[in-house]
A protein has these predicted regions:
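Generic secondary-structure signature for well-ordered alpha-helical cores
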Residues: 60, 88-94, 135, 152, ...
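Class I SAM-dependent methyltransferase SAM-binding "motif I" and its flanking Rossmann-like core
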Residues: 77-78, 87-123
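Short, basic, helix/turn surface patches
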Residues: 44-50, 95-99, 125-133
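Acidic/Gly/His-enriched mid-domain segments of enzyme catalytic cores or analogous surface patches
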Residues: 2-91
Length: 183
C-alpha cells in the first residue's frame, strides 16, 4: 500500500520493503528500474508485516528516521500493529512517523525534546491529539495549546480522550510529561 501512495503523490522512496502483493511485483520492478531506489522483497507467507520488515531493513541500512506511508490503509489490525511498532522502532533508535491523508502519527517519550514543540507552520492539519500508549502517562503539561494542562495524569482506563483535538492558536506550543508514552 505504501508504494501505491508514493506513486500517487509522485514521491520516490529511499527503500521499498514488502511482498508487494497489493502493488504487484512487475509494476514495482518497473518503477524501481526507472527511479533507482532500493528494494527488499519478501514472500507473502511470513510471520511479520511488511511494515515490521521495513523497520528492520531501515535499521540495518542505518536510517534514523522512517516516514511510513500506507500504514493506516483500511485494516485496523495492521494499523494498530504499526502504531505499536513505533515503540519497538524507537527503542532500537529509529524515529518512525506514519502519514496518511489526514494524520501524522508519531510516538513521544518524556525525554524527546526534539518532537515536543509543535509549530503552527509545521502542523499536519488543524488538530493535535495525544493518546496514551502506556496504561498511564503522568504529569502532562500543555503550554501554548488552546486547551492547556498542568501536571495532569491520563490513563487508558479513566480519561483516554482528555488530550484529543487540541489546537495551537499561537506560533508554537509545547508538551512535557514525566512518565509514560504518548502517540
Amino acid at each position: 500500500a505504501g508504494l501505491a501512495v508514493c506513486e500517487d503523490l509522485g514521491l520516490v522512496p529511499d527503500l521499498a520493503v514488502g511482498d508487494f502483493d497489493t502493488f504487484g511485483l512487475e509494476r514495482m520492478e518497473e518503477l524501481r528500474k526507472k527511479e533507482g531506489w532500493a528494494t527488499d522483497v519478501h514472500k507473502p507467507e511470513k510471520d511479520e508485516t511488511d511494515t515490521d520488515l521495513a523497520v528492520r531493513s531501515a535499521l540495518r541500512a542505518g536510517f534514523r528516521t522512517a516516514h511510513v506511508l500506507g500504514a493506516t490503509g483500511g485494516r485496523l489490525d495492521h494499523e494498530l500493529s504499526n502504531i505499536h511498532l513505533m515503540r519497538a522502532a524507537k527503542d532500537a533508535g529509529l524515529f518512525m512517523e506514519i502519514y496518511d491523508a489526514k494524520n501524522r502519527i508519531f510516538l513521544l517519550t518524556p525525554d524527546d525534546e526534539e518532537h515536543s514543540v509543535f509549530r503552527k507552520t509545521d502542523l499536519y492539519g488543524k488538530y493535535v491529539s495525544f493518546l496514551p500508549l502506556t496504561e498511564k502517562v503522568l504529569g502532562i503539561t500543555l503550554d501554548g495549546f488552546k486547551y492547556p494542562l498542568h501536571n495532569k495524569d491520563i490513563s487508558i482506563l479513566e480519561n483516554p480522550s482528555l488530550c484529543v483535538s487540541n489546537e495551537v492558536p499561537g506560533e508554537s506550543a509545547k508538551i512535557s510529561f514525566r512518565e509514560g508514552i504518548l502517540i
